[in-house]
From Swiss-Prot:
This is UPF0173 metal-dependent hydrolase Fnod_0635. It comes from the Bacteria. InterPro entries: Metallo-B-lactamas, RibonucZ/Hydroxyglut_hydro, UPF0173, UPF0173_UPF0282_UlaG_hydrolase. The lineage of its organism: Bacteria, Thermotogati, Thermotogota, Thermotogae, Thermotogales. Belongs to the UPF0173 family. One of its GO terms (molecular function) is hydrolase activity. The keyword Nucleus does not apply. Keywords: Hydrolase. It comes from Fervidobacterium nodosum (strain ATCC 35602 / DSM 5306 / Rt17-B1). Signal peptide: none annotated. The keyword Hydrolase applies.
Length: 226
């Protein structure tokens, strides 16, 4: 399996043989960190952690282009269904087995309002995703602050954690989270997209390695194969 970081919090999970492509939080248009020359493959599933524009992103456009199915909370799925998207609604704590693997929605401490014109629509509860694919456990935390809920996560092969501060955990809090999660590998996300979430990824890497956890810093467009 190949895990490709596409800037900000965008993650593409792909089967090496091309059997499936799953994208999380597809913020492409307007994302200054998105690799402009990257050729996105046909997307089978879109997973959305919450309703903010930098995560909901290009979901509707991708759905219409690829006939993708959206996996998200009940409220976001209902909103997207009205936009013509195929949906699979879930909620925090829920588990479902898809053709590509097992998905569980995990708690996240954040907001989820959907901005539409001059209105903010209710977007349900934000979440993270715990995904079991090809025998590997992948955790995408979404946008979240530090929470004791991290202690419930076990046997994580790769964790994608936000470190940018201001809206989410900063480096120090992300290291506390890392100590609770204890993944085999951690990849920092949601940082340096804009100055307001500027963070020192090398400081995070050094802290992770002191905990005995491998930290892989991916530039937008780079992949990790597991």
């Amino acid at each position: 399996m190949k895990l490709t970081f596409l800037g900000h919090a965008v993650l593409l999970i792909s089967d090496i043989e091309g059997k499936y492509n799953v994208i999380i939080d597809p913020f492409i248009t307007g994302n200054p960190a998105y690799p402009k020359d990257f050729q996105l493959p046909k997307i089978d599933y879109i997973m959305v952690t919450h309703g903010h524009g930098d995560h909901l992103g290009d979901t509707v456009e991708l759905c219409k282009k690829y006939n993708s199915t959206v996996i998200s909370n009940f409220e976001i799925c209902n909103y997207l269904q009205l936009k013509g998207c195929k949906i699979h609604p879930m909620h925090v704590g829920g588990v479902y087995y898809f053709e590509f693997g097992k998905v569980k929605l995990t708690p996240a401490i954040h907001g989820s309002g959907i901005h539409e014109g001059d209105k903010v629509l209710y977007g349900g509860n934000p979440c993270g995703f715990l995904i079991k694919v090809e025998g590997k456990n992948i955790y995408h935390a979404g946008d979240t602050g530090l929470t004791k809920e991290f202690e419930l996560l076990k046997d994580i092969d790769v964790a994608f954690l936000p470190i940018g501060g201001n809206f989410v955990m900063d480096v120090e809090d992300a290291l506390v989270a890392l100590e609770m999660i204890k993944p085999k590998i951690v990849v920092p996300i949601h940082y340096n997209t804009w100055d307001i979430i500027k963070a020192d990824e090398q400081k995070f890497k050094e802290g992770a390695e002191k905990l005995g956890i491998k930290c892989v810093i991916l530039k937008p467009g780079e992949s990790l194969e597991i």
